[in-house]
């Protein structure tokens, strides 16, 4: 089980990313655009640098919905490999059966 503070921090980051996604995208577009002046691009880069670090989507880390475990995350099921194995063996995940050949 992950620390509650780590899970809460991740939730906070997700909210920040969602709230600032549009503004960040516009600034990135301006910073990369060759059609605007160099001065304008520089201002856009500075504005991006002044934004909070946690507004960047690259700071997000997927976590298990049940335990908060950050590693061994299965995207399709949004849980960790350990929880997946337990739930699959108990038959709690529809359509998942143990392979045999």
Curated annotation (Swiss-Prot):
InterPro entries attached to this UniProt entry: Ribosomal_uS14 (IPR001209), Ribosomal_uS14_bac/plastid (IPR023036), Ribosomal_uS14_CS (IPR018271)
SUPFAM superfamilies: Glucocorticoid receptor-like (DNA-binding domain)
Keyword Iron listed: no
GO cellular component, one term: cytoplasm
A Pfam family reported for this protein in Swiss-Prot or TrEMBL: Ribosomal_S14
Keywords: Ribonucleoprotein, Ribosomal protein, RNA-binding, rRNA-binding
Gene Ontology BP annotations: translation
NCBIfam families linked: PRK08881.1
Role noted for this protein: Binds 16S rRNA, required for the assembly of 30S particles and may also be responsible for determining the conformation of the 16S rRNA at the A site.
The name this protein goes by in its record: Small ribosomal subunit protein uS14
The organism of origin for this protein: Chlamydia muridarum (strain MoPn / Nigg)
